[in-house]
Amino acid sequence: MAIEILSDGAVVRTITHVLTASLCDKLDGTLTFDFTALQKGEPPILPGMTAKYDGQYYSIVRVKRGFSAGLEISAVSCEHISYILNDEQYNLVTFVFEGYPAEGLQELLQNTPFTVGVVEPAAMVECAFTDESPLNRRAALMRFVEQ
């Protein structure tokens, strides 16, 4: 299990041994990652950095530093990078779409820091998310991929 710590897109540290790790992936879209690592002689892990684990990126939101058995440790709490879409600046009024999934994702991610990768489903889809306003973009994205 290796965790890469990135700052401004560059790897500043690779953690190959962790003391504890916990990944929470729920049906409601919750995706968090917490881990504890030795800090001795390593660059500090700070909120605002990014952790990469198992091909997924997580925003480091909290770091608690302390000592255990005389060793300096960092307890790190992370949220999946997609939580950025919860920021108010990305809210939508509504989202109505009819077309191919890749095009819908392109439209949903427009004006965000994200881009569409490989999209396997090719059948036409239609959706109308008009039941709440403002519409949280991450919630709309989760609803769209469930279509």
Model-predicted segments: where are they?
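Charged- and aromatic-enriched interaction segments used to assemble
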Residues: 73, 79-147
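Assembly/oligomerization scaffold segments
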Residues: 1-94, 142-147
